[in-house]
Design a protein with these regions (language model features):
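Conserved alpha-helical "signature site"
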Residues: 1-167, 182-247
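Terminal helices and disordered tails flanking the catalytic cores of nucleotide-processing hydrolases
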Residues: 1-19, 252-282
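Post-HEXXH active-site segment of zinc metalloproteases
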Residues: 165-177
Length: 282
């Protein structure tokens, strides 16, 4: 993550300090149990019984875990306990559920600095998550990680928005283009963009480094399978069912075999339809 001297009202700040204060303020309504669960999931040798005990302490997370374990995809027979659910789902699915709970806490209210209503930011996130996952599936890559980076790639906007509301009279941010989005105005405001704050937030919540890195570098040229998938996710939320008017990265298009343009348009249309179904089910 690039090191930049941030200043608001001529007071220097740094991303780790801002994010620690943000989390301590309760602005992101996550229980202590949820943070402990993610810490355990990031460890390869966690104890499933201990994990189940922490899950029991958060009703929302426990309910989602039980619902997933009893879904048609996983359920060969009814799953009656949270212990059974943990063993049935495994680390990847539990991490995905955690990401959904985190996104639901962070992305369901208006972002005033960006003049975006809650429904808009949630839609952006779902479309990017579905797009990234479908891109990963196309190449047999890590679908769960792709979904996670798509779902959470805008979470740093919440941190910047919390700073913006504390500085009355600040101008609202403008979406410039696909390559930069709101980052131009974010940098004018506090010296840094939302990907850096988002990456730091996820780092402090002990997300895998691959997720953190991909969030931090989302405006750089894609350099690996996960950043390729997120690029497609971002394209998916920019697509409106007509010609996509962006100078897209040809390396990504070729990686997913999406030439000619009509093939890309067809794939983005499929993503749009799947994302709309996901929105209705959420």
């Amino acid at each position: 993550m690039r090191q930049i001297d941030l200043r608001i009202n001529n007071m220097p700040i740094d991303p780790p300090t801002v994010v620690r204060a943000f989390l301590a303020s309760g602005s992101l309504p996550l229980s202590r149990s949820i943070s402990q669960v993610q810490t355990m999931l990031s460890s390869a040798d966690y104890d499933s019984c201990d994990l189940a005990e922490h899950l029991r302490m958060d009703g929302n997370l426990a309910a989602k875990v039980m619902a997933a374990a009893n879904s048609a995809f996983f359920s060969r027979q009814p799953c009656a306990t949270i212990d059974d659910a943990v063993n049935r789902l495994g680390t990847l699915q539990l991490s995905r559920i955690f990401a959904q709970v985190l996104a639901n806490a962070a992305l369901v209210h208006p972002y005033h600095a960006y003049d975006l209503p809650a429904q808009a930011i949630w839609r952006h996130s779902i479309f990017a998550a579905v797009g990234a996952e479908m891109a990963a599936r196309r190449k047999g890559e890590d679908r769960s990680a792709a979904y996670m980076v798509g779902l959470l790639h805008l979470i740093g906007m919440l941190v910047i928005d919390s700073l913006w509301v504390k500085k009355p009279g600040s101008p609202k941010f403008t979406l410039v283009n696909f390559a930069q989005e709101w980052s131009v105005d974010e940098i004018k405001f506090c010296g840094i963009d939302h990907p850096t704050f988002g990456a730091e937030l996820l780092r402090q919540l002990t997300f895998p480094e691959s997720i953190v890195k991909t969030i931090a570098t989302q405006y750089d040229d894609p350099a690996d399978s996960l950043s390729n998938a997120l690029y497609v996710g971002r394209m998916s939320r920019a697509f409106r069912g007509i010609t996509l008017k962006i100078d897209h990265c040809q390396e990504v298009i070729e990686h997913y075999d999406l030439n000619p343009e009509s093939k890309l348009q067809s794939f983005l249309t499929d993503i749009r339809e799947e994302a709309q179904r996901a929105m209705q089910a959420a």
